[in-house]
């Protein structure tokens, strides 16, 4: 098959694969940590995280309420029940060789506080009454360690805030984003920002990753109905098969060209979001994707290892975050194999990494 041959040729260039996340079979606790939200200003929120256990823990900050990047930490609904648009970043982090600085150490019964301004990542200019809550799963290492040994789910209290819209509008957005009109969706294929490509190697790598993303997504769309056991492993419920298949088809189409479409893909970081450990990130409110330096230096083009990260599936992951590809766009509900496969069907079908991991599994034969 031509697609398999092309992908095999690309994977032959791969460096050793990168794996992660919560190792298979590690315990997931429902009550190990507690998260309480409180308002400390017009749009300022404080999260107080408490270790309920009797041993010290190292909590990984990535994709949690403690993330220092302008990520979605809380869901926000207006008084009429409508979700407020998120204007921050959705990063993909490197999952191997985690550094101590990526963790927060919490002694038994100890607490740590993390404050953030929700106006930096949400349009709250209308003002009024809003309801906030946070939920997620924190990977955990033992005291002074960086090897993930477990995870803790958290569900915060509901926080009700009355926000002054004018004051909220005066807060600078994390990426200086201003409102734009809707993008044309006549041709749904990505466009590479050539000016962001500092050298031919970056452009070549991104072009190859998009091609592989298109091929992997096409294979995965077919596998949804042809490999139902694998589908159920990642997405749990047959009623979502059409939704999953449609998203893979949309990603395949979006990845199939580099000269025009609903998303803009940047070879490099032109918005300043590439903090340490970030491979790539998406601004879903703008339908833009940005690669970081370690996307090129630390990832193989295409991995032959199960549950591993590579350039192709990272690009596929990022494209699912864009509403121009398919709405509603995917969130980061569960990152890595163990967390992704622990999600409910409703969460999995809207989880970016579930699609990347499924594509990897179909290609590798996991």
Curated annotation (Swiss-Prot):
It catalyses: Preferential cleavage of bonds with hydrophobic residues in P1'. Also 3-Asn-|-Gln-4 and 8-Gly-|-Ser-9 bonds in insulin B chain. GO terms for cellular component: extracellular region. GO terms for biological process: proteolysis. Its cofactor is Zn(2+). Residues 1-19 form the signal peptide. Coiled coil: none annotated. The keyword Oxidoreductase does not apply. Binds 1 zinc ion per subunit. It is an enzyme of class 3 (hydrolase). Zn(2+) binds at residues 317, 321, 332. It is found in: Secreted. Its main location: secreted. Belongs to the peptidase M35 family. Probable secreted metalloprotease that shows high activities on basic nuclear substrates such as histone and protamine. May be involved in virulence. This is Probable neutral protease 2 homolog B. It comes from Trichophyton rubrum. The gene is NpII-B.
